[in-house]
Amino acid sequence: FIITSGLKNKSIDLVSAKKRKIIVSGTESNINPTPELTWALILGLARNLKEEIDNMYQGYWQSTIGVELKGKILGLIGLGKVGSQVAKIGKAFGMQVMAWSENLNLDTCKELDVLPCSKEDLIKNPDFLSIHVQGGERYKNCITIKEMDKMKKTAFLINTSRGPIISEDDLIIALSTNEIAGAGLD
C-alpha cells in the first residue's frame, strides 16, 4: 500500500504498482500553500528582499528600489485551481492578468477578469510570468532560452509547478546574461 500527499504524484509508477497489485492512494490536495508561495516569491523579487536582507546585515539600509505591482502585467501559464488563486491576488494588487494554457477555460477567464492570450503574447508581455501547470511530458521544456529571449529584460519568471517545465540550463544562461531580471523557484 502506498499513500502520498496530494492526488497526483509523478514519481509513482502507477502501471507497475497495478501489475504488482499495490494500492496507491492520495490525500486531498490543499491548494492554499502554492499560491501563497507564489506570491512570496513575486513580492520577494519585486522588492529585492534577498539583496535588501543581505545589505542590512552589512549595515546598509534601503539600498534598492523595488517594483510597484499596481499596473504591472501578471502572466499565468495555467489557470486551474492554483492559477486562479494567483490571478485573484494579482487583481487585488491592481495588476492586469493574462493567461494561456493548452486547455484554457474561457469561462474561468471571464469570471476572473483574466485576458486569454496566445503563448507568444504571454511570453513577451508580462512583467511577472508565473507557471501553474502539472509537470510531465505535456509541458516539458515549455520555457526554454527561446522563450526567455522574448521576455522583457525586466521580467521575472516564477515556477512553483513540479517537473522540468523550465529548462534549467537555459534559465541559468538567461539569468547570467540578464535576458530576464530574475527567477523565483520552488
Predicted regions mapped to residue ranges:
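Short, hydrophobic beta-strand segments that form beta-sheet elements in well-ordered domains
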Residues: 2, 97-101, 183-186
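Glycine-rich Rossmann-fold phosphate-binding loop(s) that bind the pyrophosphate
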Residues: 79-80
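N-terminal Rossmann-fold NAD(P) dinucleotide-binding loop
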Residues: 83-84
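Hydrophobic beta-strand scaffold residues
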Residues: 1, 23-24, 97, 116, ...
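Phosphate-binding beta-alpha-beta segment of Rossmann-like dinucleotide-binding domains, i.e.
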Residues: 20-22, 26-73, 88, 92, ...
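Surface-exposed amphipathic alpha-helices with a cationic face
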Residues: 18, 87-91, 152, 175
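An N-terminal-biased, well-structured beta-alpha scaffold segment characteristic
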Residues: 1-25, 30, 124, 144, ...
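Rossmann-like adenosine-cofactor binding region
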Residues: 103-185
